[in-house]
């Protein structure tokens, strides 16, 4: 099992830190998604997405930095590149809005739900996190 660690100290994030949450409606535009690269190999494509927590969300959750990088392999002809990013963001926001709370664990659960249960064309996902808690 992949344990989320503080990249500066190397210590695992505690349960309290990972589940420390704030109401979804209280933070406008809490997640920033960026398409790093996209490549197509015939019917198969691969893309890398970076998800960043915005400043207001990081301040509310006492985070210095929180990035999640996803390398996704799939086989949809229509939903690729920027369109895939837009649909992923919308579905993730709907999932988090239904929960009502946003935290590190809920974002990861939401990504797993959207990528593995709603998108049936995604074949594999490699996920890396870069999290740093406020030390002061």
Swiss-Prot record:
Keywords: Host-virus interaction. The keyword Membrane does not apply. Belongs to the geminiviridae replication enhancer protein family. It comes from Beet curly top virus (strain California/Logan) (BCTV). The keyword Repressor does not apply. GO terms for biological process: rolling circle single-stranded viral DNA replication. Increases viral DNA accumulation. Enhances infectivity and symptom expression. Homooligomer. Interacts with the replication-associated protein (REP). Interacts with host proliferating cell nuclear antigen (PCNA). Interacts with host retinoblastoma-related protein 1 (RBR1), and may thereby deregulate the host cell cycle. Oligomerization and interaction with PCNA are necessary for optimal replication enhancement. This is Replication enhancer. InterPro entries: Gemini_AL3.
